[in-house]
């Protein structure tokens, strides 16, 4: 009897540890680190911009090979003054709410309007967890719908606000 219990407990522990090791960890660099710390194959696409930022874009399937649930999502690492300032998960034109489900599971549930299907909800929700501000956004885009998760470390929130102000001024000038 004791051997059966031991085998069951060990089997459960292996199952738990195995499933934990397959969880997707898209934060492959720490906030404040330079972009040179990201060493991944294939080499990520780099997009410098006119506002003092540089983005590295990596398909999530390159980061989370054992977890296909978020395939189709792009992970964008935004560097300001060569310091990681924001991580964004961007999932455009997918006919699902997988980023919403991921956000609710990882950061905490939030209420949707009663009777509204998740696929039709548009809006945003914010969490403050530890040293990070996290925002989930569901919005319409030109040819459909996009889900976004933005993670900003509190130490870089002011730099992000200044960066976003520059982007906003430029967008306003384009009207």
Q: Where do the PLM segments sit?
A:
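Bacterial N-terminal signal peptides that target proteins for export
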Residues: 1-9
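Position-driven detector of the extreme protein N-terminus
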Residues: 2, 14-15, 161
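Bacterial N-terminal signal peptides
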Residues: 8-17
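Disulfide-bonded cysteine motifs in exported proteins
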Residues: 18-19, 59
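Non-cytosolic coordination micro-motifs
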Residues: 22-57, 86-175
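Compositionally biased P/S/T/G-rich terminal and signal peptide-adjacent segments
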Residues: 40, 46-80
